[in-house]
Curated annotation (Swiss-Prot):
It comes from Bitis rhinoceros. It comes from the Eukaryota. Expressed by the venom gland. Keywords: Disulfide bond, Glycoprotein, Hemostasis impairing toxin, Secreted, Serine protease homolog, Signal, Toxin. Pfam families: Trypsin (PF00089). Residues 18-23 form a propeptide. Gene3D superfamilies: Trypsin-like serine proteases. Residues 24-250 form the Peptidase S1 domain. Snake venom serine protease homolog that may act in the hemostasis system of the prey. Coiled coil: none annotated. This is Snake venom serine protease homolog rhinocerase 3. One of its GO terms (cellular component) is extracellular region. Glycans are attached at residues 80, 252. Its main location: secreted.
Amino acid sequence: VLIRVLANLLLLQLSYAQESSELVIGGDECDINEHPFLVALHTARSKRFHCAGTLLNKEWVLTAARCDMENMQIYLGLHNISRPNQDQKRRVPKEKHFCVSSKTYTRWDKDIMLIRLKRPVNDGTHIAPLSLPSNPPSVGSVCRIMGWGSITTTKVTYPDVPHCANIKLFDYSVCRDAYKGLPEKSRTLCAGILEGGIDSCKVDNGGPLICNGQFQGIGSWEGHPCAQPLKPALYTNVFEYTDWIEGIIARNTTVTCPP
């Protein structure tokens, strides 16, 4: 029965891809002006980026809890890692906020980290914030993913520039069918391309999922290898955490994370 259900979903996805010019099979280099809110995270000793994140305002960045690391450095306004933009900035964290310890999140719950920068950044040609969502995401939405993650699945190939692609938002049950052990309910989103070939991948964790123009998800977990058929990725549902995020930013000491 499960195989038949997944096969029907695959046929629906193939039909959708044929009808919608917005869907792509493989990612391409992002336009340099498309991602002023996208940030790159790495350690001072690392030569490659560890994760991505999203600038919410001049002081705050939102990413995944799994992206926590020592000696974190945050790059803003970055496009080509080999040719820095003139307005590119580097910052370090002043504060880190978690729903739970960065060591006890799960792939289906509370994989979220809010970072306050030690020094604010001003808007620029390649630096600008992305607002929190005003509405919850809708199943069937076309969503945009982006990051400096691996662009190949059989071996790790990191690009110098971020790649962007469109994927589709599915009902959470699709990911439950694909990955055994997921709970019946979760504050995560399920998104991808059911025929495979496009997905978030290594180092894209923490980056944004933008659906119908709204920041709806944080890259959390994908199948291994990436971009396999019938294996969508999981994204932390940003809308479910907006009260917590806004409370932390407003310095509300009584705000609590969703149970």
